[in-house]
C-alpha cells in the first residue's frame, strides 16, 4: 500500500474527510473530484483509496489533484478494505464516503455537517441519491429492513427529488454516499473486511452504529447524483456479485440481528437463494456462485473468493 504520509500526519485541523474508494473509473473519479472542488464547504480533505486500478488513475491524481491524499493497494482487496484504509488515514470530525461514480451537489457537504453538528445523536447521515441520467428522480433515499424476512427495502425510489426537500428520513442503512460521525465509527470499530469484503460492507458498519444507539438518517435537502444504468437490471450481477450478495447478507444478519430477527432471516433464506438463482439465470449466468455463497455463508467461510 502506498500512502502520502506527509498529508496524513499534518496537524492542520480538518472538519470533514471526504473518502473515495475507487477501481478503474478514472474519468468518473475526475468528474467527482471536480464536483467536490465546487463545494460551498471548504474545511475538508480528500482521501482516495485505489484498489489497484490499471487505467491511469494514479497518474491522473498526481497530475491534476495534488492536494488529495492518495492510497494505492498493490493488488485488489475489494472495497471494505478500502473503506477501512480511508478511515484510518482520515483526520476529519466527520467522514463523508462517496462512491467514485457520483457527482456531489455544491451544498451537500455543508448541509450534512450542519445537520450533524445540531443532532449529536445521529451517527450516520446521508444525502438523497438521485439518478445522474434523470436528476429529478430519486434512486434511493436510504433503506430499512423488513421485520421478518429482513429484506432490504429502498425508500422513495422514483419520487421527485424535490419532494424530499426538508425531510429527515429515519433509516437502517444507506448505499453509495453517507457521512459518519468519527466518534460513532471509533466505537463501532472497522469493517470485518475478510468477512464482508464487498456488497453490503458499508451497511454492515452503518447498522452496527445504529445498534450502538445512534440514529441513521437521510437528509432530504442534500443530494448526490449516481451515474448508474437504470436499465441494467440483472446484467449487473456477475459471478462475483452473485456470490457476495448472498454470503454477505448471511454474515450481516448473523452478526448484527437480535435472535428473533435472525431466526426470521434464516427461515427466509431459501427465498433469497431462489431469488438470486433467478437473477443469475435472467442475466445468462450459472447458479454455482449463488450456491457457493450460500454454503460459505452457512459454514462461516471468510476471505476473498472473487476479486
Residue locations for each model-derived region?
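A short, conserved alpha-helix in the catalytic core of glycosyltransferases
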Residues: 172-180, 184-189, 194-222
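Glycine-rich, basic loop-to-helix element that forms the pyrophosphate-binding segment
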Residues: 73-90
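A conserved acidic beta->alpha catalytic loop
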Residues: 35, 50-59, 75
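Non-catalytic, C-terminal membrane-associated alpha-helical segments of glycosyltransferases
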Residues: 240-245, 258-307
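Short, flexible, basic/aromatic active-site loop/helix in glycosyltransferases
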Residues: 145-171
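Conserved donor NDP-sugar-binding/catalytic core segment of glycosyltransferases
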Residues: 107-147
Amino acid at each position: 500500500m502506498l500512502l502520502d504520509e506527509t498529508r496524513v500526519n499534518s496537524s492542520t485541523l480538518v472538519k470533514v474527510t471526504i473518502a473515495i474508494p475507487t477501481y478503474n473509473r478514472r474519468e468518473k473519479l475526475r468528474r467527482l473530484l471536480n464536483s467536490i472542488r465546487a463545494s460551498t464547504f471548504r474545511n475538508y480533505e480528500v482521501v482516495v483509496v485505489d484498489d489497484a486500478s490499471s487505467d491511469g488513475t494514479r497518474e491522473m491524481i498526481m497530475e491534476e489533484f495534488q492536494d488529495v491524499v492518495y492510497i494505492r493497494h498493490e493488488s485488489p482487496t475489494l472495497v471494505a478494505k478500502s473503506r477501512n484504509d480511508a478511515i484510518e488515514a482520515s483526520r476529519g470530525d466527520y467522514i463523508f464516503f462517496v462512491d467514485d461514480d457520483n457527482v456531489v451537489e455544491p451544498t451537500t457537504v455543508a448541509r450534512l455537517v450542519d445537520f450533524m453538528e445540531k443532532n449529536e445523536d445521529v451517527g450516520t447521515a446521508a444525502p438523497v441519491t438521485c439518478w445522474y441520467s434523470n436528476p429529478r428522480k430519486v434512486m434511493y433515499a436510504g433503506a430499512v429492513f423488513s421485520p421478518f424476512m429482513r429484506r432490504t427495502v429502498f425508500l422513495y425510489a422514483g419520487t421527485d427529488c424535490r419532494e424530499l426537500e426538508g425531510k429527515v428520513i429515519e433509516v437502517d442503512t444507506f448505499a453509495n454516499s453517507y457521512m459518519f460521525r468519527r466518534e460513532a465509527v471509533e466505537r463501532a470499530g472497522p469493517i470485518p473486511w475478510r468477512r464482508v469484503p464487498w456488497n453490503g460492507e458499508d451497511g454492515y458498519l452503518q447498522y452496527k452504529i445504529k445498534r450502538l444507539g445512534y440514529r441513521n438518517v437521510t437528509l432530504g435537502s442534500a443530494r448526490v447524483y449516481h451515474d448508474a444504468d437504470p436499465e441494467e437490471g440483472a446484467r449487473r450481477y456477475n459471478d462475483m456479485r452473485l456470490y457476495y450478495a448472498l454470503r454477505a447478507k448471511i454474515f450481516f444478519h448473523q452478526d448484527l440481528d437480535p435472535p428473533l430477527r435472525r431466526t426470521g432471516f434464516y427461515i427466509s433464506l431459501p427465498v433469497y437463494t431462489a431469488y438470486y438463482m433467478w437473477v443469475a439465470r435472467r442475466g445468462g449466468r450459472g447458479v454455482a456462485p449463488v450456491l457457493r455463497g450460500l454454503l460459505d455463508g452457512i459454514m462461516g467461510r471468510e476471505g476473498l473468493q472473487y476479486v
